[in-house]
Structures are given as structure tokens and as C-alpha cells.
Amino acid sequence: MAEAEDIQPLVCDNGTGMVKAGFAGDDAPRAVFPSIVGRPRHTGVMVGMGQKDAYVGDEAQSKRGILTLKYPIEHGIVSNWDDMEKIWHHTFYNELRVAPEEHPVLLTEAPLNPKANREKMTQIMFETFNTPAMYVAIQAVLSLYASGRTTGIVLDSGDGVSHTVPIYEGYALPHAILRLDLAGRDLTDGLMKILTERGYTFTTSAEREIVRDMKEKLAYIALDYEQELETAKTSSAVEKTYELPDGQVITIGAERFRCPEVTVQPSMIGMESPGIHETTFNSIMKCDVDIRKDLYGNIVLSGGSTMFPGIADRMSKEITALAPSSMKIKVVAPPERKYSVWIGGSILASLSTFQQMWIAKAEYDESGPSIVHRKCF
């Protein structure tokens, strides 16, 4: 097995909030860490600490008190390439402990990623990291593969952006992809705001992490929002407690379902866009009438912001109300959907039929970064 391990492809899913990285063929990523780069706010405070000029991931998170944190990926798209390079370097050398020049690398990208961005990713892999081969795959397509399908519509909602991506026979249909700039980070912000109204203060990036954890542990999506609000007013059934790091205990009730309801009703935070259910429906309606039935019957949820209990039932209910009455609607919420993009990449990169799909270093040297548009689609 040691032989095979040497040339095992690496799979790196770069999300706005978290990086998921590991080896093709594994059933889960080996490394999951925050997509952040932190730089010291004040130089030379800690004498003799051998201070680095930048920290990445968990280390940046734990030293956040003395750092300025930056997220190089905004709304799913890389916006700061120097920091992105630091994240990849950290992924290969510190997290996976591999030499990137010895492994093919499969990277993921957001739907509708600008062409220049795909080229830049390709260039950095070959020129900075000297990878022998690489490939760029669309995140939602990998999630669909992970669910064992090649046709369906994926609602992929992470920390920084949500997309609805209709896929037919393995190919995303670009004209029908819709983007919703409402995702996990906005929900965390919303919960911070609700808690602030109640007299708690959460302002720093450290405190935001606490609220994110609270959201992940306690929030859920109600099947009937209005009815749930009524229930919450009269009974304590929805109340749960959460202990803060300092030992203080917070009780949250209606906030548990008010927070993620925003995904269905963005108007709650003053956004004029349609919710996740309507965006999914609109995406389907942009597709050819002949394939809609296949899409309605294969609505696949993916990404950390689809992890809320109750989301599949609510999506099913809302889309059923929008779709033709005779239409069979099926919403699939795979239990591993938090990592299904990565898992799909792991599956794809280990297929024998995929091996001719890689962009090889020689092809890159001959054609330059634009090779990515010819080989990855």
C-alpha cells in the first residue's frame, strides 16, 4: 500500500469558512480548519516568541486576540491570492505533511467562478507548488456525485455563499445556476444581533465563534414558522440552555428557529432576495422543460448551512407549494453533507476513468493557464 500512498491524489475543498483537505480514496477529509490568515496587530509585543509574520487556520484562531484575521475567500470566490497561497502551503506542509510536487491535486471551485480565477489557481499549483497534475471541479457537482447521482439539482450552502446548481448527466447547466449571498456567516451575524437585543454582548471575532457554535448545536428550521412562534410564546418546550466559556448560561428559545428561518425568508434581515426554496424552484424553471422532472425528484442538499434539523421537510413543503401539483418532489439530505463536496472529490479523483482527465504539468507548460478551460468543465 505504501507504493500507492506515494502517488495518492490530494483533494482540497476551499470554502469561505473552512478548508477540507485529505487524500483521494479516504471517506473523510484528514484536515478541516478555518480558512483564515492572521497577522500580528502589533509587532514585537511578545519578546523572544519568534513571532511569525502570519498564522493560518486553527493557530490563527487560537491567537486571534493579538492578530488581525482575514478570510481570503469571500462568497466562495478567492479574493486574496497571497493569503490563499499561505492557506495552500499550510494545507500541504503542516496539515497533510506531503510534498505537493509528488501528488496530483484536485481543487474545488464555486459555481460561476470567474475564468481568471480558475487560471490563477492552475498557475499557482503548477508554478508555486510544482504539482505533477491538477484538476478543478465545481463544488456542487462533486456533492451530487457523492450522493450517487449524475442528474439533479444541488442546493449548496456554506459559510459565505449559497448556490442552486442544476446538473444533467454530470454537467452543471451554467445558465440556470443561481447565487444567493446568504449563508452561514449571515446566520451567525443574525443570531449575534438577536442575542445583543437581549442584552448579551458578542462583538469580537472570538465571540462570533461562540455564537457560531451555539447556532450549530441548537438552531433548527421549523416546518411552520408562525405556528412555532405561537408555541414558543406559550410553552418552554423549545427552550435550550448553552454554557458560555466563562460559565455563564444562556437560555435560548424562539431564537433557535428564528435564526435559520432567514434562509427561507431573507426579508427578515432586510434582503430583497428569494429564499432557498424559491431560488431552487427558479433554478429548475430556467432549465429545459424535459429535464425538470428529474431535477424535482433529485434535490440534493449540501454544505454546512444545510445541516439544520428540519431543513429537508421544510424545503420539500415549500417547493411542493411552488411546483406543478402532480410533480413528485424529493429532497435528499445526506448525513455527511457537511463534507459531501470533499467526499465527491475523493471519489472522482480515485476513479480509474478519471486518470486521463488530469491536467498534466507538460500540458500546462505547453498551453499555459488557459488549459484549465479546455480540460475542466
From Swiss-Prot:
Q: Which GO terms describe its cellular component?
A: cytoplasm; cytoskeleton
Q: Which InterPro entries match?
A: Actin, Actin/actin-like_CS, Actin_CS, ATPase_NBD
What molecular functions are annotated in GO for this chain?
Answer: ATP binding; hydrolase activity
Superkingdom, according to UniProt?
Answer: Eukaryota
Compartments annotated for it: namely: Cytoplasm, Cytoskeleton
Report the EC number(s), separated by commas if there are several. 3.6.4.-
Top EC class for this record: hydrolase
UniProtKB keywords: ATP-binding, Cytoplasm, Cytoskeleton, Hydrolase, Nucleotide-binding
Q: Which reaction does it catalyse?
A: ATP + H2O = ADP + phosphate + H(+)
Would I find Hydrolase among this entry's keywords? yes
Q: Tell me the protein family, please.
A: Belongs to the actin family.
Job description of the protein:
Actins are highly conserved proteins that are involved in various types of cell motility and are ubiquitously expressed in all eukaryotic cells.
Q: Which PANTHER family match?
A: ACTIN
Report what the protein is called. Actin-3
